[in-house]
Curated annotation (Swiss-Prot):
InterPro entries: SKA1, SKA1_MBD_sf. One of its GO terms (molecular function) is microtubule binding. It comes from the Eukaryota. The keyword Nucleotidyltransferase does not apply. Coiled coil: none annotated. PANTHER family: SPINDLE AND KINETOCHORE-ASSOCIATED PROTEIN 1. This is SKA complex subunit 1. Keywords: Cell cycle, Cell division, Centromere, Chromosome, Cytoplasm, Cytoskeleton, Kinetochore, Microtubule, Mitosis. Component of the SKA complex, composed of two copies of ska-1 and a single copy of ska-3. The core complex associates with microtubules and may form dimeric assemblies. Interacts with ska-3 and microtubules. Component of the SKA complex, a microtubule plus end-binding complex of the outer kinetochore that stabilizes spindle microtubule-kinetochore attachments, promotes alignment of chromosomes at the mitotic spindle equator (chromosome congression) and assists suppression of the spindle assembly checkpoint. Kinetochores, consisting of a centromere-associated inner segment and a microtubule-contacting outer segment, play a crucial role in chromosome segregation by mediating the physical connection between centromeric DNA and spindle microtubules. Belongs to the SKA1 family. The gene is ska-1. It comes from Caenorhabditis briggsae.
């Protein structure tokens, strides 16, 4: 055993000599490493002491510990808040909730139903302004149904016109070609590309309203829902 210890000391001295020769500032580096090791050792001892304190059972029940002692043990700094104003009386809720809700509801402005429609629906007041000889047997619901189909077609057309070349399908391409042919026939008289002809709307209507489409156009022109432009045999309509 003594021979082993002697050989171990010799090997250690030989290694230290080699380190001193090859490592610059070996003594200062070794001293800093030693200090760091000692600091780590002290830190580990503190951690073990804290763990021992935590694991040890408290001599008294937790309910007997005061908040100050508990905060001090946990390392929590306690800040006192002064000059806190407490209201003398709490505002009471009205005993008439139904009336209050009605007042609040009356002050809320409801948004219009029209939104971003291309052709707005007809109001009852506008419907009454249409001459009786133009209306015939057409009702407000009939006209609004026709107006809804016009808006549906223009919305779809606007969506197709807004597509990029990559988004356009083969069917969309055929529809666009037909619209361009109609634009050529219009000879530049239309102020917008969102137009339609009678054949665009008729397939969207019911059989009964298809017969009334020609009679509904003068009514819609009267209240300025649609405008028309005649170019040869074709009549173009736009909002």
């Amino acid at each position: 055993m003594e021979a082993f210890m002697v050989s171990f000391e010799r090997q250690k001295d030989a290694k230290f000599c080699m380190y001193r020769e090859n490592i610059p500032n070996f003594e200062s580096t070794l001293s800093s490493i030693t200090k760091s090791t000692n600091s780590i050792k002290i830190l580990l001892e503190d951690i073990s002491n804290v763990q021992k304190v935590i694991t040890d059972p408290c001599e008294q029940s937790c309910s007997s510990c005061s908040p100050n002692v508990l905060n001090k043990f946990l390392g929590i700094e306690e800040k006192l808040v002064n000059n806190v104003e407490i209201p003398d009386s709490v505002p009471q809720k009205s005993t008439r909730p139904c009336l209050d809700d009605e007042k609040e509801g009356s002050s809320v402005v409801q948004p219009p139903e029209s939104g971003n429609r291309h052709v707005q629906l007809i109001s009852e007041q506008e419907f009454k302004s249409i001459p009786k000889y133009q209306l015939g047997r057409l009702t407000l619901d009939n006209l609004n149904e026709i107006v809804g189909k016009m808006d549906e077609f223009l919305t779809k057309k606007n969506a197709i016109l807004g597509k990029t070349n990559k988004q356009i399908t083969r069917q969309d391409r055929e529809v666009l070609d037909n619209w361009r042919e109609l634009e050529i026939k219009a000879k530049g008289r239309l102020p917008t590309t969102l137009f339609f002809i009678e054949n665009d709307i008729r397939p969207l209507l019911t059989e009964r309203l298809r017969l009334s489409f020609a009679k509904a156009i003068p009514c819609l022109r009267h209240i300025r829902r649609v405008r028309e432009e005649r170019c040869g045999p074709l009549t173009f309509y736009y909002a």
